[in-house]
Regions:
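Bacterial N-terminal signal peptides that target proteins for export
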Residues: 1-8
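A generic structural signal for short, non-catalytic loop/turn and secondary-structure boundary residues
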Residues: 9, 62-64, 181
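C-terminal motif of bacterial Sec signal peptides marking the signal peptidase cleavage site
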Residues: 15-18
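Extracytoplasmic soluble-region selector
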Residues: 23-26, 30, 40, 50-171, ...
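Sequence signature of WD/YWTD-type beta-propeller architectures
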Residues: 155-594
Length: 594
């Protein structure tokens, strides 16, 4: 397998996924009570309850005759800084059927909907100092409740690393004026404009190229809920530009304040420290509403071949070697691998093309203890190239086509999910399969249909097929994407709800089906598409995720291959969001490939 230099995360919004139940948010007026659900800023009176209820029986004696409540202030915006929490005193008023409106604050319970933003001490709200965000303030007594929005805007001026050229005192004052010198405008290089990030990755670098000799910069992140500025010199010169990795606390301030609230605007301003100011273009950076879970395993050829593991959300999130070659356990490299859907088991192929000895691990927490590690190729029943697990991890399907016998190539084998051994079950096909995939709902197998045989790892001129479960077996193959001259469609992978697949598509150079850059491996011209698992379905190019970054300089041939879904769907506004990893040769800003 040729080297794949990088792994990208793509966010996909599944707007057709309905939420279980609905949450209705109103305008948060916080006005006089009326019938409602108590979550939209309006209060609730007795008529808003089902059945006949004597309100006086559920109220303290001082509130007998209460008919409605309201809260002040309404729809409040407060400023939070790392040095000082925001505070706000709230008052709740009651309307009675036999006396004037009165302050009833001491009789009600006050709380915020999002407790990570702060708490009430009596009727006084006090925020945390670590981040801002959006929440609702709720007040209630007996059958009555009232709510109002609360906006906490996080404001911070942070200083970058120290250098031999110290920052000026209060550097934010240097940037107080308007831009005066366009020649000082930096070029913002990374992150890519329009990127969405998981809030818990805790790693973000900003790359830029200075202009006009400037060496004092303001990295500004701005949003209705945030004004976060970092003042910095070019502390890490890289490829003619500058790189700054956000401190973990800064990343959390940024992500926890704005997750799920839409794009943050990133702009870099530069000063010549003599009154001249210039600004870069503005890029949008968005943080997803919910954290990405689990981790990702991937194969690398950097610094020796290995299967690597990266755990999202770790305090120190760095890739670690999971399995590597030439140690006491493995006589050669392992590359292609398949993880069970519960993340507990893994099956691997050893030796690459024309080898395919199986390595099986029933417990990924103990990678030193292989359950099955075939020493040679004598047992043809223990050779695989690609594999895919059923939903409960009790078995996996596998293919191996690096043999001369066509009937053996045209076969899907099933293996025991506890031992890794091949079962006495298989499916004979009228074509050679590769890149086997089992849907999360267990009802479909998908695969590449090989047009021109080479090896299972590098098949030419593929289409895509699916097979549907019929009772205890799978039915005849159905063509989702037919084989087409000069194009290779390969490596399907199902979304968590099995409603569609992503796959790689390569257009062959000069229409040559047998070109090395069109062999279903790390093809330079590969792009990521999505398609429903139905005959004749129309593929959709994932243009936003597949677009080039600044340093790619418009090059759209980025070797985007082997897309893999995270198994977890997350809330994102009114829809659902899932993440896809893609191997790629795209440039990591100023750091280049890899």
């Amino acid at each position: 397998m040729r080297q794949l230099l990088g792994c990208a995360l793509l966010a996909m919004a599944l707007m057709t996924w309905g939420c279980e139940g609905t949450v209705t948010q109103g305008n948060g007026s916080g006005g006089d009570t009326s019938q409602g659900d108590g979550l939209n800023g309006d209060g609730v009176n007795a008529d808003g309850l089902s059945g006949d209820v004597d309100n006086d029986l559920t109220l303290p004696p001082s509130l007998v005759g209460l008919t409605a409540i309201r809260i002040e202030p309404q729809d409040k915006t407060l400023i939070v800084t790392p040095q000082a929490p925001a505070t706000q005193q709230y008052t709740v008023y009651g309307t009675f059927d036999d006396k004037p409106e009165a302050d009833i604050t001491s009789e009600v319970v006050l709380h915020v909907q999002e407790p990570s933003l702060g708490l009430f001490i009596g009727a006084k709200f006090q925020s945390v100092t670590t981040h801002g965000g959006e929440t609702m303030v709720h007040a209630g007594v007996g059958p009555f409740s009232v709510s109002t929005p609360l906006h906490l805007k996080f404001v911070s001026n942070a200083l970058g690393p120290e250098t031999s050229n110290p920052l000026p005192t209060a550097p934010w004052t240097v940037f107080a004026g308007a831009d005066t010198s366009p020649g000082l405008a930096p070029q913002l290089v990374y992150p890519n404009d329009g990127v969405m990030l998981p809030p818990n990755v805790a790693q973000l670098e900003v790359h830029w190229r200075p202009s006009g000799g400037a060496d004092l910069f303001e990295l500004g992140f701005h949003h209705a809920a945030l004004d976060l500025n970092i003042y910095i010199r070019c502390t890490e010169p890289t490829s003619g530009g500058c790189v700054h990795k956000l401190e973990p606390d800064t990343y959390r301030q940024l992500a926890e304040t704005t997750d799920g609230l839409g794009p943050v605007q990133l702009t870099i301003r530069a000063s010549d420290e003599a009154g001249g100011l210039g600004s870069s273009a503005t890029f949008d950076v968005e943080f997803a509403q919910e954290a990405v879970e689990g981790g990702v395993y991937y194969w690398t050829t950097s610094d020796g071949t290995a299967i690597m593991r990266f755990d999202f959300g770790d305090a120190e999130p760095n890739p670690e070697v999971f399995v590597t070659a030439n140690d006491d356990r493995l006589d050669t490299c392992v590359g292609c691998h398949a993880l069970s859907r519960d993340g507990k088991k893994m099956v691997m192929s050893k030796g690459g093309q024309n080898d395919g000895r199986i390595v099986f691990l029933s417990d990924v927490t103990r990678p030193e203890n292989f359950d099955l590690n075939v020493p040679n190729q004598d047992d043809q029943d223990l050779l695989i190239q690609f594999a895919a697990w059923n939903p409960d991890g009790t078995r996996f399907a596998a293919i191996y086509g690096d043999v001369d016998n066509e009937s053996q190539r045209n076969r899907v084998h099933f293996h025991d999910g506890n031992t890794g051994l091949r079962l006495n079950e298989s499916i004979d096909l009228p074509f050679e399969p590769s890149h086997i995939e089992w849907s999360p709902d267990g009802k479909m197998l998908a695969m590449s249909r090989v047009g021109t045989h080479q090896t299972s790892q590098r098949p030419f001129n593929c289409g895509l097929e699916v097979m549907r479960k019929q009772g205890n077996s799978f039915g005849a193959p159905e063509t989702v994407i037919p084989i087409q001259p000069g194009v290779n469609h390969f490596n399907p992978n199902f979304a968590p709800d099995s409603s569609f697949m992503v796959f790689s598509r390569s257009v062959c150079p000069n229409g040559d089906d047998e070109n090395d850059e069109c062999d279903g491996d790390s093809d330079l011209y590969a792009q990521t598409y999505a398609v429903q698992p139905q005959p004749g379905a129309t593929p959709v190019f994932l243009a936003r995720g597949g677009g080039p970054g600044v340093e790619d300089q418009g090059n759209k041939n980025l070797s985007d291959t082997f897309p893999r879904f995270s198994p977890f769907a997350k809330r994102q506004g009114a829809g659902r969001l899932v993440w896809v990893t893609v191997s790629s040769r795209r440039r990591f800003g100023l750091r280049g490939n890899g």
